Structures are given as C-alpha cells and as structure tokens.
Amino acid sequence: MEDPKLANFNVTTTHYKIVNDQEIPLYVIIPKGVHTGKPPILVHFHGGYLIAGHALYPDWTAQWSLDYATLHSAIRISANYRLLPESKGLDIQSDVRDLFTWIENDLSAYLKRIGSDITPDYERVATYGESAGGYLAIQSGLMRSDLVKPVIAAYPMTYLDRPWYSVASTDKSPFGAPQLPKAVLDQHIAAMESGKIATGAFPPERMQLALPILQNGLFPQIMGTDESLYPAKVVEKRKEGEKAPFLLVLHGTEDTAVPCEHSVDFVKVWEEKFLEGSVVGKFESGDHGFDGTATLETPWLKDGLSDVSKVWIR
C-alpha cells in the first residue's frame, strides 16, 4: 500500500550495490511538481539501531523532512543498507561510501532512464537521518566532506562506545519496552546463513534483535571496534578548523532510546574542532521521535533549518 505521506512525490527504486547476489535498494523520491532544472540532493538514512528499519517505513518518516525537500524541490534519496548482526559496522560504512559513488556516477543516467529531465546539482548535497540514520548522516558527512555541505542529524546515535551501548543494564527500556532475553539474539545469530545479508525491515520486525543488543551492551562487539565507526573519534583526529559540513542536531531531552546528553556532548566536540558556527543543537522537550509533529513553521525547527538552507541552498 502506498504511503499517503509520499502521495505528492514520484517514487522509483533501483539498487546501488550487489552483495553476494543480493541487491541493496535505494528510493529516488522527487516532488511531483519538479520536472526540469537542477535541484539539490537530500540523502536520507533510516533509523532502527542499525539493526532494523527501512528507507520507506512511514512511521519513522518525519513529515517536515518531506516538506523541506518539497520546499527546495530537492531529490530525496532514501537508501537501505546492510544491517547488524548479519553484517558488521565496516560493511555498513562501505555501503554508505558506495551509495555516494552511485549518486556521483549513476544518478544522472538513472534520472534520464526514468524519463526525467532534471539534472542533480552536486554542488548542493545534504544528508539527513534519524536515530541510527542520524549516525550515518554524520558519518557520511565526515567521509564525504568534499561533497556534503550540511548534515541534519535527528536524535543521532553518536557515542556507541559509551555504557549506554557497551554495558549490560536493566535501565534501558526505549518507550517502556520490556527486557528481552539475550537468548532471542543468540538463537538468531546461530541460525544466520553465511553470506546472507539483511537490508531493511519494517518494524516491529527485527526490533526483538535490537533490544537485547542494546540492553546487553553488545554494540561494540556486534559492530566492531574500528575507530572509524565512532564519530567522536573521527572528529578528534581532524585538524582544528578543517573543512567539515555544517551540522544541525535535533534531540528530545526525554529521549528513552538514544541519550540526549550524548548529542549535547557531540555538539561541543564538533564546535571545538570545526569552530564556532559549524554546528547548531536544538534540544527540546520530548522522547525519541519528538519531531514527529513539528512543521516547517515550528520555531526551533524553522530556526535550525534556516541555518541548513544557508549552507545547502545558498
């Protein structure tokens, strides 16, 4: 069934990568009124703790993000990617890198193939994601600071080596979720087929894997410990004042899934490294997904996006 949120968009799909004969899809989402010209690009990554979620899952699609793309006649590219635990963090990072290669090398030809007369503007590329997608939006901005101008990270996972992600505790109950036995995860891992990947699932599918990984503090073990997977460590290694995208972070102060204080700390780290004016943090009352009812006229969001637009649209 078509998502009513996408009723005003033309949505097409293709794959940007094949792994072990399995395609990894992306979705090109263009406002229906956009037929010609050189529109900007908004690359979107979905949430789901890197374990669940799907690029087109409607409940996690913030209406304001679609309205923002429409406002600027932007091409929104929402991509799936390999998921934990079937894959590792470096595999996901490889997918992000290859997605941008596809955008640079194949998007223009793909648009012609589907009969579109628009030409993507590679001088105006932004990334956006929610939760785990916010983490990937940040990572992609750091990986491709030559291409990405601003990053919008909504309640992003950032410090995946902190106790919230790395130490077992019964205090972690996103939205009041129950404690799930680790046996659920162990059984899934034992049944995994070698070489078979997972690339997208509409919740609640796979959330029964995300919860025990979070509650048992297994993220570093499941993801891997390579420093490139941890954005604060990546930022730490950069030179002061080095070129980086502008970063807008949005986070609800009562978030039960991803701690808001992590975003507060990350904003400080980003500003210290990339200097004043390189980042804006908007911290408002609410739980995970607190922006679900926000509109482009909501003052804190309007203010944050105006800073993004100055860098992205110019």
Stretches with model-predicted labels:
Residues 43-45, 154, 283:
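Alpha/beta-hydrolase
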Residues 17-19, 55-64, 77-124, 293-300:
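Catalytic nucleophile-loop/oxyanion-hole region of alpha/beta-hydrolase
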Residues 294-314:
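Catalytic active-site module of serine/aspartate enzymes centered on a nucleophile-bearing elbow/loop
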